[in-house]
């Protein structure tokens, strides 16, 4: 019998066996080859010693219960190794099933997070008890990595909750529940408040249920809510894929489709066949490119970014105690709330007490909503609000060890507000400017301590957007960069680090996406087709509606400033076909965007979109083309948007504005809505059909048809010729 290396067997004198999950080679337990072998050995021993066993408790020696599949293994799966993955997965499922049907009570004592494979192990137990530990989460988030639960999660949640609830509450959204919410939604049976109580409750269940079995193994069991064999359920079945398509906007996310198929098909067959169906759909996803893209971005890249891969080494952390937020408008109010929520005292300053109080009112509104929805208590909300002091008096900023300026995008105004307070705050206070486009090096000229000056580009709405783009100016010191990084992590956001340049990374690259969509309008392409192309490419916001939200005048202002800067430096402005469209929209038609009541869309008196402006078809046509929407392939529309952002990102690497592939991928997804299925803007190139050579060939084809802006940069061509990928691996 194979020895168990990752599962410890502990048996007391009452006949209760505790299986302690404890991989000696990892900080967290995962469903790797060592676990598979250990599970097989443990299963054989349980069956051999069945008569001396009264019950089984499954728990963990780690801080978390079980972390799920080993993503380092899964990201390497190819069609050639798919059979090996299928066989290994089925072996795990068979052994969990053998334990589940052993005829003894089996209890999962979840001492920490049980996500993915961890919750699937718990599902194979007859009773699930979760410790109400801080940060503990329960659920099946595989869909967020382009996968489905492949260890029995689809099969068992469908039989536990029914097809509809399993899909909506667990599988399709990847929801991660706190222990108490997991209990409310039927994912666990009990919640314990201490580790001792956790084990005591597990033993109590064993004592009370000596002949326990799963509900679905009892004679006459029916899946809650019915199956497609039920005419009433079958009549509603066509709504499932329709709803799914609406949820994804038709973007190429294969995981939700496979989850739906595995759930519905598995509900119509016996348990073992359902397990095989689930396994095949899982392996199809694991061997595909989308899951590799999403695992790279949402696990490996995100982990690298948040762990400080780009934080200067050897500099001690200095948590911010008191922050001054200059400007109580939309951005300043959101920044103040985010800081106060993280436990930092905030002085929110504006030019008048009324303006400052209005900024605090934003936090009051958010807190009231959170209390009404049960997401916080009134006591916690009051404590958060007490940390925000609105003021118009600069002297109240005394003692602040960090400053975040969030006034209007005007260099002279930003200089003025810093000069007003730089001698009042702490003498070594970190000085941060929230700007989306203005060069940080020039802004730093307005303060005396340029070494402590840095850019923090927050995204709107600040309380919801997880990313902050940190911009290092030419004279920004390493200590300021480290402190800024730590401040972003302190307020529980994800920091990416870039070097100074007009537009930095995110603002410059999203501009390419917008320009390409607008350029297509100028070519006479049906505007609704352009919007649909963006949606089906996976963008969360359609390109023309996004342009209206930003206003047409802002990009034009930024373009004119950038053009002037390039020409003053002796360069040549490249221009873009979108510029003529924007100029006509503003100057000829007076359509400046949503705030002006008219843009690419019409708006009603309440500011609600009333449809695309019919004048777009009338005023923008391509000469000699009867129907550009027919002559320009839909795939070209999508890839023009995707490629425009990817190619400009490579240029930013060439220019040294970007220094990290992980920062580029995470920044593009979390900051500017690059489609998640791609794994980010550079992983999109890596994962493109044919790899980098395939991407280069396609870029050249687009350049030949649509303009030299699609010509692949030298760095991309060089990497393609060398057979390399975009990676931070040294």
Predicted regions and their residues:
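Gly/Ser-rich catalytic serine loop of serine hydrolases
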Residues: 108, 112-118
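Glycine-rich loop at the start of a catalytic domain that most often binds anionic cofactors/ligands
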Residues: 66-76
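Conserved catalytic cysteine-centered active-site region
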Residues: 95-108
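Conserved CoA-thioester-binding segment of acyl-CoA-metabolizing enzymes
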Residues: 1-59, 83, 94-97
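N-terminal glycine-rich phosphate-binding loop for ADP-containing cofactors
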Residues: 10-12, 22, 76-81, 86-91, ...
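Short glycine-rich donor-binding/catalytic loop of glycosyltransferases
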Residues: 132-137
């Amino acid at each position: 019998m194979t020895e168990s290396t990752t599962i410890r067997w502990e048996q007391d004198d009452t006949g209760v066996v505790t299986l302690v999950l404890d991989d000696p080679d990892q900080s967290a337990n995962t469903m790797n080859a060592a676990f598979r072998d250990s599970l097989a050995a443990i299963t054989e021993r349980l069956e051999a010693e069945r008569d001396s066993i009264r019950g089984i408790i499954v728990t963990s020696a780690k801080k978390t219960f079980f972390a799920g599949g080993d993503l380092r293994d899964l990201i390497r799966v190819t069609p050639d190794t798919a059979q090996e993955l299928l066989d290994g997965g089925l072996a795990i499922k068979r052994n969990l099933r053998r334990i589940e049907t052993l005829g003894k009570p089996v209890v999962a004592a979840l001492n920490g997070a049980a996500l993915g494979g961890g919750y699937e192990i718990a599902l194979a137990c007859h009773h699930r008890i979760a410790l109400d530990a801080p940060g503990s989460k329960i659920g099946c988030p595989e869909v967020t990595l382009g996968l489905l639960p492949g260890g029995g999660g689809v099969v068992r949640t469908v039989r536990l909750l029914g097809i509809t609830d399993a899909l909506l509450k667990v599988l399709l959204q990847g929801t991660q529940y706190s222990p108490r919410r997991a209990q409310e939604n039927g994912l666990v049976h009990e919640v314990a408040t201490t580790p001792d109580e956790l084990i005591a409750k597990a033993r109590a269940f064993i004592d009370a249920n000596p002949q326990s079995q799963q509900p679905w193994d009892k004679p006459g069991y029916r899946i809650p809510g019915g199956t497609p064999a039920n005419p009433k359920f079958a009549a509603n079945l066509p709504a499932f894929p329709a709803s799914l398509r609406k949820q994804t906007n038709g973007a190429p996310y294969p995981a939700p489709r496979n989850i739906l198929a595995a759930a519905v098909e598995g509900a119509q067959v016996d348990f073992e066949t359902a397990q095989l169906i689930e396994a095949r759909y899982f392996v199809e996803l694991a061997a595909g490119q989308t899951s590799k893209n999403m695992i790279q971005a949402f696990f490996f890249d995100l982990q690298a970014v948040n762990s400080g891969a780009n934080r200067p080494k050897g500099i001690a952390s200095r948590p911010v105690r008191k922050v001054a937020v200059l400007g109580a408008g939309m951005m300043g109010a959101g920044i103040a709330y985010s800081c106060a929520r993280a436990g930092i005292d905030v002085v929110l300053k504006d030019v008048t007490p009324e303006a400052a109080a209005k900024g605090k009112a934003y936090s009051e509104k958010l807190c009231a909503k959170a209390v009404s929805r049960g997401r916080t208590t009134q006591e916690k909300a009051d404590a958060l609000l007490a940390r925000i002091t609105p003021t118009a008096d600069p002297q109240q900023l005394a003692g602040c060890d960090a400053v975040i300026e969030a006034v209007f995008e005007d260099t002279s105004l930003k200089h003025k507000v810093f000069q007003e307070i730089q001698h009042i705050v702490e003498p070594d206070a970190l000085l941060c400017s929230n700007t989306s486009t203005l060069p940080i090096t020039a802004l730093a000229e307005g303060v005396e301590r340029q070494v402590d000056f840095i850019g923090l580009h927050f995204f709107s709405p600040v309380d919801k957007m997880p990313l902050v783009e940190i911009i290092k100016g030419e004279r920004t010191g390493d200590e300021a960069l480290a402190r800024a990084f730590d401040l972003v992590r302190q307020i529980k956001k994800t920091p990416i680090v870039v070097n100074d340049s007009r537009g930095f990374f995110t603002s410059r690259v999203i501009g390419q996406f917008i320009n390409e969509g607008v350029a297509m309008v100028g070519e006479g392409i049906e505007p609704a087709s352009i919007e649909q192309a963006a949606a089906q490419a996976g963008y969360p916001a359609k390109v023309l509606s996004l342009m209206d939200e930003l206003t047409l005048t802002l990009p034009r202002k930024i373009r004119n400033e950038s053009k002037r800067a390039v020409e003053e430096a002796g360069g040549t402005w490249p221009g873009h076909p979108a510029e003529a469209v924007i100029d006509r929209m503003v100057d000829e038609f007076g359509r400046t965007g949503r705030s002006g009541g008219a843009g690419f869309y019409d708006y009603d008196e309440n500011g609600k979109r009333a449809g695309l402006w019919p004048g777009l078809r009338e005023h923008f046509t391509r000469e000699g083309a009867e129907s550009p929407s027919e002559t320009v392939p839909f795939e070209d529309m999508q890839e023009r948007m995707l490629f425009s952002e990817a190619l400009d990102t490579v240029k930013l690497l060439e220019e040294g504005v970007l220094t990290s592939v992980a920062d580029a991928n995470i920044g593009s997804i979390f900051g500017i809505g690059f489609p998640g299925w791609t794994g980010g803007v550079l992983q999109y190139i890596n994962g493109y059909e044919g790899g980098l050579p395939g991407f280069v060939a396609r870029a050249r084809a687009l350049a030949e048809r649509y303009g030299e802006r699609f010509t692949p940069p030298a760095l991309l061509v060089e990497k393609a010729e060398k057979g390399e990928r975009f990676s931070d691996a040294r």
